[in-house]
């Protein structure tokens, strides 16, 4: 009975978390396309914040060699004994021939946890996808970080320098009562409905990220910011 009750509580908590994350991330907008563009615009702000942060030099130096970058402008983490986190993210993949960043493909992030925890935190995260295995895992319907692909927290500090061989390297900035988001164990799933709404037709992540058969000019500014940052920071490595 205790196990059943705990499961029910976890399900209810997770439903509340997802609802809270959606409200925060979407800003209560009624238009689906406006909702997606809001996330793209917020992702651009997040990316700019990380590129200006003197503690994110490892991220800045290694952006140019990444296969892709996953930007989550708002990940909500909350809990009381049972907890979890959730949010929306956009993924851009780097075309190795042209250097252009193709995207965005929209994804959902979800994590559940059990253990002593209390409070709420809101984070913005930028995750480098450093291997083909990591990128391929995101082209599937869903992937579990730390399971289907390896992940490490990125080095932070003005002089941070480390050799990391995981498929994903995650960086986060948080504000809240307790610690920031740990993406290990996070399930990343393709937001098919959001991709459909943003591009006006059913599309797969491969259509958006690899073949460039889907394009929305409203995301060009973020794609260009990625290209500029990667080009500018190549000499830092």
Per-region residue spans from a language model:
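N-terminal secretory signal peptides that target proteins for export/translocation
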Residues: 1-10
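N-terminal non-cleavable signal-anchor helices
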Residues: 9-11, 19, 41, 47
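Small-residue-enriched, tightly packed secondary-structure blocks
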Residues: 33-237
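Sec/Tat signal peptide C-region and signal peptidase I cleavage site
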Residues: 26-32
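Bacterial N-terminal signal peptides
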Residues: 14-25
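Hydrophobic alpha-helical segments, especially transmembrane helices
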Residues: 10-13, 74
């Amino acid at each position: 009975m205790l196990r059943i009750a705990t499961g029910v509580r976890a399900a209810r908590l997770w439903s509340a978390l997802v609802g809270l994350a959606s409200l925060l991330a979407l800003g209560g907008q009624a238009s689906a396309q406006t909702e997606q563009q809001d996330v793209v615009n917020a992702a651009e702000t997040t990316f700019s914040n990380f590129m200006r942060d003197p503690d994110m030099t490892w991220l800045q130096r290694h952006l140019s060699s990444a296969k892709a970058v996953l930007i989550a402008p708002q990940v909500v983490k909350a809990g009381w004994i049972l907890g979890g986190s959730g949010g929306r993210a956009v993924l851009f993949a780097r075309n190795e021939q042209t250097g252009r960043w193709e995207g965005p493909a929209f994804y959902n992030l979800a994590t559940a946890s059990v253990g002593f925890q209390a409070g709420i935190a809101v984070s913005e995260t930028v995750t480098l996808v450093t291997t083909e295995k990591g990128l391929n895992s995101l082209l599937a319907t869903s992937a579990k970080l730390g399971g289907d692909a390896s992940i490490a927290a990125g080095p932070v500090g003005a002089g941070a320098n480390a050799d990391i061989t995981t498929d994903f390297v995650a960086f986060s900035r948080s504000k809240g009562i307790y610690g920031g988001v740990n993406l290990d164990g996070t399930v990343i799933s393709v937001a098919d409905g959001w991709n459909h709404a943003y591009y006006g037709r059913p599309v797969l992540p491969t259509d958006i990220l690899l073949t460039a058969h889907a394009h929305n000019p409203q995301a060009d500014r973020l794609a260009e910011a990625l290209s500029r940052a990667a080009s500018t920071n190549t000499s830092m490595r």
